[in-house]
Regions:
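C-terminal accessory domains and tails appended to enzymatic cores
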Residues: 25-146
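Active-site beta-strand->loop->alpha-helix modules in alpha/beta enzyme cores, enriched
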Residues: 1-27, 143-146
């Protein structure tokens, strides 16, 4: 699904409503995992430990065909189809900066599973904790180097 730190209100709304609906299910009927993905803003701002990488290497022809279905997002000079495929390739290269590429395409997800396992978790606080870990990583690096 979408994630609750998405750039678009409609996408955030979808993620929240889905989480709320899953929370209404009996625990044994809930999915074992729930991931929120992002295309527009991307999730490369998250710490590597928080990112869930999804290997998108296979079937590039099928991926391109599926992206091409959304004519309204491809027509008129905005080539979201090419940008999406390019971003996946870039993630595959940049994710492991000191190793050789293991994939030719990666997309990142946010693990939303804790939000469906524990309905008492606050959705906003969950997002802020992820942002906080990223901020702490940057603070630590700057403290070490300055």
């Amino acid at each position: 699904t979408h994630n609750h730190a998405d750039k678009h209100d409609t996408h955030v709304g979808v993620a929240i409503k889905l989480i709320e609906a899953i929370r209404l299910l009996p625990a044994d009927a809930r999915p074992k995992k729930l991931y929120g993905c992002e295309v527009w803003r991307d999730l490369d701002w998250m710490t590597d430990e928080d990112k869930i990488p999804f290997d998108c290497s296979g079937h590039e022809n099928l991926q391109a065909a599926l992206l091409g279905v959304f004519d309204s997002q491809v027509a008129g000079g905005k080539r979201y189809d090419l940008a999406t495929m390019g971003r996946r390739k870039a993630h595959a290269t940049y994710f492991a900066s000191h190793g050789t590429d293991e994939t030719t395409g990666l997309n990142f997800g946010m693990d939303l599973t804790p939000l469906i396992e524990d309905p008492s978790l606050d959705i906003n606080a969950f997002a802020q904790a992820i942002i906080g870990r990223f901020a702490d990583e940057i603070k630590g690096r700057l403290a070490k180097l300055t």
